[in-house]
């Protein structure tokens, strides 16, 4: 699928706006290109590559023009561009994803523990939303998006997207972290390793323990 060139600026705007409330530490130098050092001490972020060895490829990624494979259980694919793909994002407080959705495909309820998200729809029709905290009575904020529409998901809030159209959908999203993380709710609760006690989940979700065990068997294999 070819992404409409006229809507590319919206994706760029999403990235620029993600700078405003970046949650990662601000850099204290021009750049700090990430480098993996198994012999080093763990730090909150990444070690810096010697600036004299930094080159253009440390700030480059290619491939967001290519659709992701949505032939899976949820009918979506997230192509992530964070510090793991672009080491030069280290300390920059931003990252980017492309999300492809098959018709009726979804990005299931999940959270990003370390970053807010701003999403721009490029093709198709999405129903998107997030749920506020217990303190706010778990209110649902949701909208149907069309090409060019933008929606924000606050940091830590459970949110989702589902393709409600008859054609594939494409969205881009900027996140206010070099590695925002993702916690998919169903996989985390029912697919933890080792499993959470079924009796605990049965009472928490008001389900029969046998149903919980069935869900654990399903999500534990993903």
UniProtKB/Swiss-Prot annotation:
Disulfide bond sites: 32-48
Residue ranges occupied by any Cupin type-1 domain in the UniProt entry: 62-213
InterPro entries per UniProt: Cupin_1, Germin, Germin_Mn-BS, RmlC-like_jellyroll, RmlC_Cupin_sf
The entry's keywords: Apoplast, Disulfide bond, Glycoprotein, Manganese, Metal-binding, Secreted, Signal
GO molecular function: manganese ion binding
Primary localisation category: secreted
Binding-site residues, Mn(2+): 110, 112, 117, 159
Annotated GO CC locations: apoplast
Highest taxon, organism lineage: Eukaryota
Glycosylation sites: 77
Keyword Disulfide bond belongs to the record: yes
Subcellular location, record wording: Secreted, Extracellular space, Apoplast
Signal peptide residues on this chain, from the entry's feature table: 1-22
Subunit structure: Oligomer (believed to be a pentamer but probably hexamer).
Family: Belongs to the germin family.
Described function: May play a role in plant defense. Probably has no oxalate oxidase activity even if the active site is conserved.
Protein's name in the database: Germin-like protein subfamily 1 member 18
Source organism of the structure: Arabidopsis thaliana
Encoding gene (name): GLP2A
